[in-house]
From Swiss-Prot:
Location (main, coarse): cytoplasm
Species whose genome carries this gene: Acaryochloris marina (strain MBIC 11017)
GO cellular component: cytoplasm
Underlying gene: proA
Disulfide bonds: none
PANTHER family: DELTA-1-PYRROLINE-5-CARBOXYLATE SYNTHASE, GLUTAMATE SEMIALDEHYDE DEHYDROGENASE
A GO molecular-function annotation: glutamate-5-semialdehyde dehydrogenase activity
EC number: 1.2.1.41
Keyword presence, Repressor: no
Official protein name in the record: Gamma-glutamyl phosphate reductase
Catalytic activity: L-glutamate 5-semialdehyde + phosphate + NADP(+) = L-glutamyl 5-phosphate + NADPH + H(+)
């Protein structure tokens, strides 16, 4: 792989040159490349799964945390789903070349704002080999090159995946150099210094890791931090429905960043709801912790102040009884990570207040927090979920990987014509 024989600067420059060519590629060319990549991944499935088994065995021996192991493991079903995600990106509308604004400044002087690729992305992620396929597909469709740096625990899986991607692209009009893999820890720090060649860094990991990246690079950072997600069960909730939402939000994939970590319950329904909830969670092997009011109703372990600010990423959940909707919102805004928070209620006014006042990228009403996902949103896939307030926010798909440029077409006009006492007026007419 070129990344192993060339310096990182050389690799980044090769990726940038390939991205410049890709930026001008037609939608058909990019879609053909994505289909070729999907076919190559299918053909390489045995090698990819074998590499992942090697990674998983080494990770187990090293005592990897359960949450990281769940993200690391790539079975045939998960791989098949990721390949389907690559194909789904090909069906999405091309985000490049969209005319966002067209305005006549004067006769034969027309301004357009047109979407264009960012350039080269640097994506650093933990034990998520499936992220390689998601990110590579989105980068190619949006006309960007990408430098991928996975966690060391996923090294063999990432190498097998990128090898297949390169093989798929080798017979297309898209250069394999648009996707490159970094393999050493030292390259992570070096990547952060490549502000001449990399246009956006996307770190996927803990808050501490994202903060470290932000403090050690001059490159813009799209922060994807922890997912401390909440479910608030209001006094007007349908209790059985709220149990189903809570269980799905916790157990469907507990290692995911959109899994619920804290459940807040209105005290008016706590005596009826908590026994149902804890029984359902414990039947699914979830360790339940609770505040003093929760412990007075059901037999669970104690939740401490630390628990409210913890992303478990595992079959653990904390429960707190609150006196009101406003108390629930205050708790979420204090301890949440701004990822995804949900309310279960039949009171539309309460739901509206919750959805307006909770500060998160995703606010849901009567549904699982697990819906916070680019594929489920119809984005095809995602490079990550941004919890920052500036856009892009939430699951970042194609639209978050393009910027725009202003194109002005004239017939020899000069600014002097439009200045001075007899200045020619602008027409400023939208076309």
């Amino acid at each position: 792989m070129t990344v192993l024989t060339n310096s990182l600067t050389e690799v980044a420059q090769q990726t940038r040159q390939a991205a410049i060519q890709l930026a001008g590629a037609s939608t058909e060319t990019k879609n053909q490349a994505l289909e070729a990549v999907a076919q190559a991944l299918e053909a390489a499935t045995p090698e990819i799964l074998e590499a992942n088994v090697q990674d998983c065995q080494q990770a187990k021996a090293a005592g990897i945390a359960n949450a990281l192991y769940a993200r690391l493991k790539l079975d045939a079903t998960k791989l098949k789903g990721a390949i389907a995600g690559v194909r789904s990106v090909a069906t999405l509308e091309d985000p490049v070349g969209t005319v966002q604004l067209k305005r006549e400044l004067d006769t034969d002087l027309v301004l357009s704002r047109v979407s264009c690729p960012l350039g080269v992305l640097g994506v650093i992620f933990e034990a998520r080999p499936d992220a390689v396929m998601q990110i590579a597909a989105l980068a190619m469709k949006s006309g960007n090159g990408v430098l991928l740096k996975g966690g060391q625990e996923a090294l063999h899986s990432c190498q097998a995946l990128v090898k297949a991607i390169h093989q798929g692209l080798s017979n297309t009009a898209v250069s394999p150099n648009v996707v490159a893999l970094l393999t050493s820890r030292e390259e992570t720090l070096e990547l952060l210094n490549l502000d001449q060649d990399v246009n956006l860094i996307i770190p996927r990991g803990s808050n501490d890791f994202v903060r470290f990246v932000q403090e050690n690079t001059r490159i813009p950072v799209l922060g994807h931090a922890e997912g401390i997600c909440h479910l608030y069960v209001d006094q007007a909730a349908k209790l059985d429905q709220a149990v189903e939402i809570a269980v799905d939000s916790k157990i469907q994939y507990p290692a995911a960043c959109n899994a619920v970590e804290t459940i807040l319950v209105h005290d008016a329904i706590a005596p009826q709801y908590l026994p149902k909830l804890t029984a359902a969670l414990q039947d699914n092997h979830v360790k339940v912790l609770g505040d003093a009011k929760t412990q007075a109703i059901v037999d669970v372990g104690p939740a401490t102040e630390t628990d409210w600010a913890t992303e478990y990423g595992d079959l653990i959940v904390s429960i707190k009884v609150v006196a009101s909707l406003s108390d629930a919102i205050a708790h979420i805004n204090q301890y949440g990570s701004g990822h995804t928070d949900a309310i279960a209620t039949e009171d539309d006014q309460a739901a509206a207040v919750f959805m307006n006042q909770v500060d998160a990228a995703g606010v849901f009403h009567n549904c699982s927090t697990r819906f916070a996902d680019g594929f489920r949103y119809g984005f095809g896939a995602e490079v990550g979920i941004s919890t920052q307030r500036m856009p892009p926010r939430g699951p970042v798909g194609l639209e978050g990987l393009v910027t725009y440029k202003y194109q002005l077409k004239g017939q020899g006009q000069i600014v002097a014509t439009y200045a001075g006492s007899d200045a020619r007026p602008f027409t400023h007419k939208d076309l």
